[in-house]
Amino acid sequence: MTNKISSSDNLSNAVSATDDNASRTPNLTRRALVGGGVGLAAAGALASGLQAATLPAGASQVPTTPAGRPMPYAIRPMPEDRRFGYAIVGLGKYALNQILPGFAGCQHSRIEALVSGNAEKAKIVAAEYGVDPRKIYDYSNFDKIAKDPKIDAVYIILPNSLHAEFAIRAFKAGKHVMCEKPMATSVADCQRMIDAAKAANKKLMIGYRCHYDPMNRAAVKLIRENQLGKLGMVTTDNSDVMDQNDPAQQWRLRRELAGGGSLMDIGIYGLNGTRYLLGEEPIEVRAYTYSDPNDERFVEVEDRIIWQMRFRSGALSHGASSYSTTTTSRFSVQGDKAVLLMDPATGYYQNLISVQTPGHANQSMMPQFIMPANNQFSAQLDHLAEAVINNKPVRSPGEEGMQDVRLIQAIYEAARTGRPVNTDWGYVRQGGY
């Protein structure tokens, strides 16, 4: 491949996708956000993990082509005409290096179309993945997907504030929707998305990849089997140093695009993880936040935030996220019989869990042996396909995404006021774990 894409292509004009380049200008109109193209910034290494975990074939740590990490060979492909067709909306680093390669392990799904504000980039990606160039759309002609019966669903991988608009447009086009987390930047937008899905009689699934990760599911199974005993405490920590010089990260520092800082981006893993590990909803939250007033990265969004949640069972949780401390992804669940440790807890491929009992630690880690069928991205993509084919509910529906956004807003309120906030809203989880 000799084609090259500059990382500065039309940088000042638009935001093209999640983990892609963000506008350097204050002009944040919808046209500025979605109308222009952006370049391919060099992707960073995958989330760090222990050597006990093995990556799938072809999962190089650093992308080696302009279209991101190469897609590994699909060892058990189904006939293409029997697969569920996705249109990928947004071609940022996450789409290029995780989602698109993830289709190699899918048994029921295929890449049918691409949607991007950068035509040159889209053509390169389409060529590498065998997508018909006539199936390349941009943000202005996105609604034409309604005329393509081979597109069954769209996967929205755009900045948070654009999720609602493109989800609603997709439903109006008669397509199912998978949307990246957080679901939206407001509870009102979440409700609009849910209402649009119901009106179109289509499925809405939020891309909570850890719900489909073998290690996270194994952790839930251990807890549900009472291996830890009565649960008392959950602690989560998700942190990463925000590089404001990385064009792919700049939109995350703009409140109008991101809706918030580290909590909306990475803290949500701990928030959602606490809920699915405990299997219940918090009834009260408290929170504290801090951003260095001299750090220009955090003029609009928070850097560090910690929150505590109280549950009806008596369990308590402590969550933390940060944009200025070294990368961590760590969960701990304490019961009266044992402690479950997850470190890394929310990595892409190398999550590990262990159980420690009183008097000694059981250090026999349970590594995630990755096969394409167990890849969390492949499993997530196929889950929506199977739910549609079999007319079953999805594991991570829109209501689940809205609950997290509502809790995030409550956490921000608690941090702002310095008072506890009641969250006993009577929410009942749908879809199960």
Curated annotation (Swiss-Prot):
Gene name as annotated: gfo
Secretion signal, residue range per the UniProt entry: 1-52
Cofactor remark: Binds 1 NADP(+) per subunit. The NADP(+) cannot dissociate.
Gene3D superfamilies from the UniProt entry: Dihydrodipicolinate Reductase, domain 2, NAD(P)-binding Rossmann-like Domain
One Gene Ontology term from the biological process aspect of the record: sorbitol biosynthetic process
PROSITE patterns membership: TAT
Broadest EC class assigned to this enzyme: oxidoreductase
Enzyme nomenclature, EC number: 1.1.99.28
Catalytic activity, as annotated: D-fructose + D-glucose = D-glucono-1,5-lactone + D-sorbitol
Keywords tagged on the record: NADP, Oxidoreductase, Periplasm, Signal
Changes after translation: Predicted to be exported by the Tat system. The position of the signal peptide cleavage has been experimentally proven.
The protein's annotated pathway: Carbohydrate metabolism; D-sorbitol biosynthesis; D-sorbitol from D-fructose and D-glucose: step 1/1
Main localization of the protein described in the UniProt heading: periplasm
The keyword Oxidoreductase is assigned to this record: yes
Subunit structure: Homotetramer.
Cofactors named for this entry: NADP(+)
Xref: InterPro entries: Gfo/Idh/MocA-like_OxRdtase_C, Gfo/Idh/MocA-like_OxRdtase_N, Gfo/Idh/MocA_Oxidoreductase, Glc-Fru_OxRdtase_bac, NAD(P)-bd_dom_sf, TAT_signal
Subcellular localization, as worded in the UniProt entry: Periplasm
Molecular-function annotations in GO: glucose-fructose oxidoreductase activity; nucleotide binding
Gene Ontology cellular-component terms listed: periplasmic space
Protein family per UniProt: Belongs to the Gfo/Idh/MocA family.
Annotated protein name in UniProt: Glucose--fructose oxidoreductase
SUPFAM superfamilies: Glyceraldehyde-3-phosphate dehydrogenase-like, C-terminal domain, NAD(P)-binding Rossmann-fold domains
Natural source organism: Zymomonas mobilis subsp. mobilis (strain ATCC 31821 / ZM4 / CP4)
Renumbered residue ranges of the record's region Disordered: 1-24
